[in-house]
Every structure is written in C-alpha cells, then in structure tokens.
Amino acid sequence: MYKRQLYDGFKKNKTINEVLDKPTVLTIYEMIKSQILSYVNGVIRAGKESVVFWAVSPDNDDIALKTYLISTSSFKKRASYISGDPRFSRIKSGTRNLVYLWAKKEYQNLTSCIGCGIPVVKPIAVRKNVLVLEFIGKNGVPEKTLVECQVNKKDYKSAILLIEQLYKKAHLVHGDFSEYNIFKTKNGLILFDLGSAVDLQHPNSQELLKRDINNISRFFVKRGLTVENPIDVLKKIQNEL
C-alpha cells in the first residue's frame, strides 16, 4: 500500500524530486508510513526558505506540507530570531540543525497560539525540516492573503488585534508580520508563517513589535485607509496608555 502511495505521491511529481534534497524526501516518506499524510500534490507556494505543497491526509482532507530548504543560506541571517529566545537556548552548529530547530519553533509557536484561541493555521505534525499544517482553502487552492484582497477598516482592526493577541495572550511577537502572511477568509483573518515569532524575553522583541505595527500600518495606508498612529498602537499593546 505504501509503495503505491510513495510512487503516486513522489515518483510522478518531478517538482518534489527537483526541489527537495534526499533527506527531506525521506522524511516525507516516513510521514506517509506513519500515516500523518497519504499523498503529496503540487506546489502551493515557493520561496527562498521554504516550499509549500498541497497534500492529502489519511482521512482525505486537504493539508499543507511546508518543507524548509536546507540548502538556503538565508537561515543563517535568521539565527538571531532563535539565539535570543530563552525557549531555544541550545543551538547545535550547522545549517541543517538550525533549519530543524526553525521548523520546531514554528510548530511550537502555532501550538501556543491555538491554545490561546488566536486564529492561526493549525499545526498537525513536525519532523526535522517538514511541517504539516491545516490547509486554508479548498480543492488545493489556498485562500487569498491580504495583499491579494480588497481591504477595509475592519481588516485593519483585525490585523492590529492579531498583533495584540500574540503579545498579550501567547507572549509572542511575530517579527515578520505583513499583508503576505495573513489569510482573509469569510470567517476573518488567519495568521500563518510564525517561524520568526519570538518570546517577549527576546532582547529584540520590542523592536520587532514596533516594526510589525509599522509594516502593517504602512500597507493599509497605501490602500487608502486611515490608521491609528503606530506609536499609540505600540503603547496600547504595551499597556503604556
């Protein structure tokens, strides 16, 4: 049974074999054998650091398979997001270990957010550099992100609320919060890509919070909306107003 699944899910999918290194493909094989997923379809999104595939669970539900690329050099630049986080004090040397820890960090961040009732993509499993996630969309087509949608004042308030909930409930700062990693659905905004999120004890957490607020405020201003002064938003979130 697994041989057929592996053949269907990988051998016919040249993209997987071309994009992913052998250890990553073997990790996905292991996940299939463990019945975490049963089939891998095409690429949903490809970036410098990761490739996201549309996959199918053993229950025939759509899921997202996020694979962090071991070969990329950009992870070395992101080491500061981990080294200052008290939750990850011991970092083994080497890019591969850093990427594995990054995947684990994203899984842990998402799990914390779910536990706090924050609308984020639900994590299903993590193994090495492969993260299995809830699929936000239908029939292999993901929901549109904020940058792809018309936005309004409600979206702005919801985005700021996400930053506030991360800070006050999960004690996290996203660190890379933007219109590119927020899905707009009929039920509201859903946040994803939380690998960069840091604990409030991280030495750069407040600067990252300020940057997150500025970035998303700038987006809504470009879309013609009036936004609250980012400094006031920052102080409110920090409870200084």
Residue ranges, per PLM feature:
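Conserved ATP-binding subdomain of kinase catalytic cores across diverse folds
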Residues: 8, 15-142, 220
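Alpha-helix initiation/capping motif
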Residues: 13, 17, 95, 99, ...
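Residue-level detector of family-conserved "landmark" positions at structurally sensitive sites
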Residues: 42, 123, 176-177, 230
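Short, glycine/acidic-enriched loop or turn micro-motifs at the edges of active sites
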Residues: 69, 137, 179, 184, ...
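Conserved kinase catalytic-core helix
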Residues: 94-120, 126-127, 142-180, 185, ...
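Short small-residue beta-strand/loop micro-motif enriched in glycine and branched aliphatics
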Residues: 141-145, 199-202
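C-lobe/activation-segment region of protein kinase-like
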Residues: 155, 167-174, 185-241
